[in-house]
Protein backbone atom coordinates (compact mmCIF):
# COMPACT_ATOMS: atom_id res chain seq x y z
CA UNK A 1 0.00 0.00 0.00
CA UNK A 2 1.23 3.50 -0.82
CA UNK A 3 1.72 6.26 1.73
CA UNK A 4 -1.42 8.03 0.49
CA UNK A 5 -3.49 4.89 1.08
CA UNK A 6 -2.31 4.67 4.70
CA UNK A 7 -3.28 8.31 5.27
CA UNK A 8 -6.64 7.74 3.55
CA UNK A 9 -7.44 4.69 5.71
CA UNK A 10 -6.53 6.58 8.90
CA UNK A 11 -8.86 9.48 8.00
CA UNK A 12 -11.83 7.22 7.14
CA UNK A 13 -12.73 6.85 10.83
CA UNK A 14 -10.49 9.33 12.70
CA UNK A 15 -11.76 8.17 16.12
CA UNK A 16 -10.27 4.69 15.56
CA UNK A 17 -6.78 5.74 14.43
CA UNK A 18 -3.80 7.92 15.35
CA UNK A 19 -5.67 10.90 13.85
CA UNK A 20 -7.75 11.19 17.05
CA UNK A 21 -4.76 12.27 19.20
CA UNK A 22 -3.46 14.55 16.44
CA UNK A 23 -6.84 16.27 16.09
CA UNK A 24 -7.18 16.72 19.84
CA UNK A 25 -3.85 18.59 19.96
CA UNK A 26 -4.40 20.52 16.73
CA UNK A 27 -7.86 21.81 17.61
CA UNK A 28 -6.55 23.50 20.73
CA UNK A 29 -4.47 25.73 18.44
CA UNK A 30 -7.16 26.04 15.75
CA UNK A 31 -9.67 27.48 18.23
CA UNK A 32 -7.31 30.39 18.97
CA UNK A 33 -6.70 31.17 15.28
CA UNK A 34 -8.76 33.54 13.10
CA UNK A 35 -11.70 32.04 11.20
CA UNK A 36 -9.87 32.16 7.84
CA UNK A 37 -6.13 31.43 7.89
CA UNK A 38 -3.65 30.51 5.18
CA UNK A 39 -1.64 27.36 5.92
CA UNK A 40 1.70 26.20 4.57
CA UNK A 41 0.65 22.68 3.55
CA UNK A 42 -2.57 20.60 3.60
CA UNK A 43 -3.53 18.65 6.73
CA UNK A 44 -4.92 15.78 4.62
CA UNK A 45 -2.41 15.45 1.78
CA UNK A 46 -4.23 12.47 0.22
CA UNK A 47 -7.57 14.30 0.00
CA UNK A 48 -5.98 17.55 -1.16
CA UNK A 49 -4.12 15.86 -4.02
CA UNK A 50 -7.23 13.91 -4.96
CA UNK A 51 -9.12 17.21 -5.30
CA UNK A 52 -6.45 18.86 -7.46
CA UNK A 53 -3.83 20.29 -5.08
CA UNK A 54 -0.22 20.59 -6.27
CA UNK A 55 2.67 22.23 -4.39
CA UNK A 56 3.33 24.94 -6.95
CA UNK A 57 3.11 28.71 -7.38
CA UNK A 58 -0.42 30.07 -7.61
CA UNK A 59 -2.02 27.39 -5.40
CA UNK A 60 -2.86 28.17 -1.78
CA UNK A 61 -4.58 26.21 1.00
CA UNK A 62 -6.74 28.04 3.54
CA UNK A 63 -8.33 26.63 6.71
CA UNK A 64 -11.79 28.03 7.51
CA UNK A 65 -13.86 27.55 10.66
CA UNK A 66 -17.67 27.79 10.48
CA UNK A 67 -20.26 27.47 13.24
CA UNK A 68 -22.13 24.17 13.54
CA UNK A 69 -25.90 23.78 13.61
CA UNK A 70 -28.63 26.19 12.52
CA UNK A 71 -28.32 29.80 11.44
CA UNK A 72 -27.44 32.39 14.11
CA UNK A 73 -30.08 35.04 13.42
CA UNK A 74 -30.21 38.40 15.23
CA UNK A 75 -33.22 39.01 17.47
CA UNK A 76 -35.58 41.71 16.07
CA UNK A 77 -35.47 44.98 18.03
CA UNK A 78 -39.17 45.78 17.61
CA UNK A 79 -41.71 43.78 19.54
CA UNK A 80 -43.03 40.64 17.91
CA UNK A 81 -44.59 37.46 19.13
CA UNK A 82 -41.81 35.02 19.99
CA UNK A 83 -43.36 32.46 17.63
CA UNK A 84 -43.07 34.80 14.63
CA UNK A 85 -39.62 36.19 15.36
CA UNK A 86 -37.86 33.55 13.28
CA UNK A 87 -34.71 33.18 15.38
CA UNK A 88 -34.49 29.52 16.39
CA UNK A 89 -34.72 26.46 14.14
CA UNK A 90 -33.79 28.44 11.01
CA UNK A 91 -31.53 26.41 8.74
CA UNK A 92 -29.51 27.75 5.81
CA UNK A 93 -30.26 26.36 2.37
CA UNK A 94 -26.47 26.17 1.85
CA UNK A 95 -24.22 23.55 3.40
CA UNK A 96 -21.60 24.58 5.96
CA UNK A 97 -18.87 23.48 3.52
CA UNK A 98 -20.24 25.87 0.90
CA UNK A 99 -20.27 28.72 3.44
CA UNK A 100 -16.60 27.94 4.24
CA UNK A 101 -15.67 28.10 0.54
CA UNK A 102 -17.44 31.45 0.10
CA UNK A 103 -15.69 32.95 3.14
CA UNK A 104 -12.29 31.85 1.82
CA UNK A 105 -13.09 33.40 -1.59
CA UNK A 106 -14.15 36.65 0.09
CA UNK A 107 -10.85 36.85 1.98
CA UNK A 108 -8.81 36.18 -1.20
CA UNK A 109 -10.72 38.02 -3.98
CA UNK A 110 -7.98 37.52 -6.59
CA UNK A 111 -8.26 33.72 -6.37
CA UNK A 112 -10.80 31.09 -7.41
CA UNK A 113 -11.94 28.15 -5.28
CA UNK A 114 -10.91 24.80 -6.75
CA UNK A 115 -12.33 22.51 -4.05
CA UNK A 116 -12.51 21.88 -0.30
CA UNK A 117 -12.56 19.06 2.25
CA UNK A 118 -13.39 18.45 5.92
CA UNK A 119 -10.54 18.40 8.46
CA UNK A 120 -12.27 18.40 11.85
CA UNK A 121 -15.09 19.45 14.12
CA UNK A 122 -15.95 19.94 17.76
CA UNK A 123 -19.19 20.81 19.55
CA UNK A 124 -19.25 24.39 18.29
CA UNK A 125 -17.60 24.55 14.86
CA UNK A 126 -16.38 22.69 11.79
CA UNK A 127 -13.09 23.20 9.99
CA UNK A 128 -12.62 22.90 6.24
CA UNK A 129 -9.53 23.35 4.10
CA UNK A 130 -10.16 25.21 0.85
CA UNK A 131 -7.85 24.95 -2.19
CA UNK A 132 -7.52 28.32 -3.95
CA UNK A 133 -5.97 28.97 -7.37
CA UNK A 134 -4.65 32.28 -8.75
CA UNK A 135 -5.85 32.43 -12.40
CA UNK A 136 -3.38 35.25 -13.26
CA UNK A 137 -0.28 33.29 -12.21
CA UNK A 138 1.83 32.31 -15.30
CA UNK A 139 2.53 28.82 -13.89
CA UNK A 140 -1.24 28.23 -13.67
CA UNK A 141 -1.88 29.60 -17.18
CA UNK A 142 0.71 27.17 -18.61
CA UNK A 143 -0.62 24.11 -16.75
CA UNK A 144 -3.26 22.16 -18.69
CA UNK A 145 -4.89 20.82 -15.53
CA UNK A 146 -5.55 24.34 -14.18
CA UNK A 147 -5.71 26.79 -17.10
CA UNK A 148 -9.45 26.23 -17.59
CA UNK A 149 -9.87 28.34 -14.42
CA UNK A 150 -8.32 31.32 -16.24
CA UNK A 151 -11.38 31.69 -18.49
CA UNK A 152 -13.85 34.43 -17.59
CA UNK A 153 -16.71 31.94 -17.35
CA UNK A 154 -15.23 30.59 -14.10
CA UNK A 155 -14.98 33.97 -12.38
CA UNK A 156 -16.71 33.87 -8.99
CA UNK A 157 -17.57 30.18 -9.47
CA UNK A 158 -17.99 29.59 -5.72
CA UNK A 159 -20.77 32.18 -5.35
CA UNK A 160 -22.61 30.66 -8.32
CA UNK A 161 -22.58 27.15 -6.85
CA UNK A 162 -20.16 25.67 -9.41
CA UNK A 163 -17.83 23.89 -6.97
CA UNK A 164 -18.44 20.28 -5.91
CA UNK A 165 -20.11 21.36 -2.65
CA UNK A 166 -22.24 23.89 -4.56
CA UNK A 167 -23.39 21.35 -7.15
CA UNK A 168 -24.26 18.85 -4.44
CA UNK A 169 -26.44 21.41 -2.66
CA UNK A 170 -28.20 22.29 -5.92
CA UNK A 171 -29.04 18.62 -6.58
CA UNK A 172 -26.79 18.37 -9.65
CA UNK A 173 -24.85 15.32 -8.43
CA UNK A 174 -27.84 13.10 -9.27
CA UNK A 175 -29.38 12.05 -12.58
CA UNK A 176 -32.53 10.19 -13.61
CA UNK A 177 -35.48 9.36 -11.38
CA UNK A 178 -36.00 11.87 -8.59
CA UNK A 179 -33.79 14.52 -10.21
CA UNK A 180 -36.21 15.68 -12.93
CA UNK A 181 -36.73 19.14 -11.42
CA UNK A 182 -33.09 19.89 -10.56
CA UNK A 183 -32.00 21.04 -14.02
CA UNK A 184 -31.07 23.58 -15.29
CA UNK A 185 -31.72 24.80 -11.73
CA UNK A 186 -34.60 24.45 -9.27
CA UNK A 187 -35.75 28.02 -9.96
CA UNK A 188 -35.39 27.83 -13.75
CA UNK A 189 -37.18 24.48 -13.91
CA UNK A 190 -40.30 26.03 -12.35
CA UNK A 191 -40.31 28.77 -15.00
CA UNK A 192 -40.11 26.39 -17.97
CA UNK A 193 -43.12 26.38 -20.31
CA UNK A 194 -45.10 23.18 -20.09
Curated annotation (Swiss-Prot):
Cysteine disulfide links: none
GO MF annotations in UniProt: RNA binding; structural constituent of ribosome
Q: What is this protein called?
A: Large ribosomal subunit protein eL15
Lineage summary: Archaea, Methanobacteriati, Methanobacteriota, Methanomada group, Methanococci
Q: Does the keyword Ribosomal protein apply?
A: yes
Instruction: Name the segments for region: Disordered.
Output: 161-194
> InterPro entries from the xrefs?
Rbsml_eL15_core_dom_sf, Ribosomal_eL15, Ribosomal_eL15_arc, Ribosomal_eL15_CS, Ribosomal_uL23/eL15/eS24_sf
Which biological process terms from the Gene Ontology are attached to this UniProt entry?
Answer: cytoplasmic translation
Q: Which organism is it from?
A: Methanococcus maripaludis (strain C5 / ATCC BAA-1333)
Amino acid sequence: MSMYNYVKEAWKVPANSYVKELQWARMQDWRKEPSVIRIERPTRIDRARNLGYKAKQGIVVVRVSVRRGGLRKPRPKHSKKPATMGINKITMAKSIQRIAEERAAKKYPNMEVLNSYWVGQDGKQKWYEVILVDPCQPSIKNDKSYNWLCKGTHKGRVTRGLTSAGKKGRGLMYKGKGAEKARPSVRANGKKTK
